Amino acid sequence: MSLNEVSLRIPTEHMANVFGQFDANIKKIERTLGVTVIVRDDQIKIIGNESATNGAAEVFNQLHELSKRGNVIAEQNVNYALALLQEHKGSQMVEIDKDIICHTINGKPVKPKTIGQKDYVDNIRKKMVVFGMGPAGTGKTYLAMAMAITAFKNEEVSRIILTRPAIEAGEKLGFLPGDLQSKVDPYLRPLYDALYQIMGAESFQKNMEKGLIEVAPLAYMRGRTLDNAFIILDEAQNTTPAQMKMFLTRIGFGSKAVITGDATQKDLAPGAKSGLDVALRVLKNIEDIGICELTSKDVVRHPLVQRIVQAYDDYEKKQSNKTNRKNVRAGRKNDGRQK
């Protein structure tokens, strides 16, 4: 088989970032695509079969473009560039990076990092109600918070309302010590963390005192109509069908709602229906409601977290298949007995 060669230039100021510590990114690309990469000065030569060398060149070009845009190239960037290459979507990586939602208090840009996240953010921009489902680390809550804060700063809404069911792991608010705020704070900590990072603690506290930002358990939404607000319901998998219906019918004029959850992390009583599951079935065909499914491909935490999520996904699929096969066999036995 004849070997193909592709040459390209990576300027010296970007080489360390693109190649990684001890050339870790080069080695990853070589292993994954089965190519050999030779670096001389600012030139790199890629040797292998035609498809692999062209693919490797595309990955290096995408990483170079990200580096030029000020990104620190991490292992997850390389992994995602290689994954997009397999899906023939490599060119979308830089386009995703251009979508800056806002900046943190330290000036760091907040933006989607995967195709799934970009679709989620675009849905929030276009739709009145958006469901964002996915495992931990997919950015579903953080991106929703960034969109809420941006809408608030741009005066598209007059307030932000953050809520989640506050009954988890068998703990009821009435049995916990302290006032309401101290009772619900532990449950709402992930929302506070995002607010502090993007808005800053001082600005957050001022807006809380003015009533422009409200953080409360879901039960406190009952009987209200929420106009001109950006409302986020987090941990929606732990709602009951009645709670979910109550929440959705609170949405008023000029408001936007984002519902986030992970169907695999329910803390409901055994056998209890999840309001999130029911809502997705009931509302799937309604216009102006967006439903976004984020997966292990959208995990943007440490690469090990992505592998853990994928391993659990694979395990749960195998268990589900085993259960289905058992049910089929049991059904056949019952049919035989009836005959």
Question: Can you name each region flagged by the protein language model?
Answer:
Residues 18, 25, 55-59, 244-247:
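Hydrophobic side chains in well-ordered alpha-helices
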Residues 31-38:
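A short, structured beta-strand/loop element
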Residues 14-31:
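Short amphipathic alpha-helix segments
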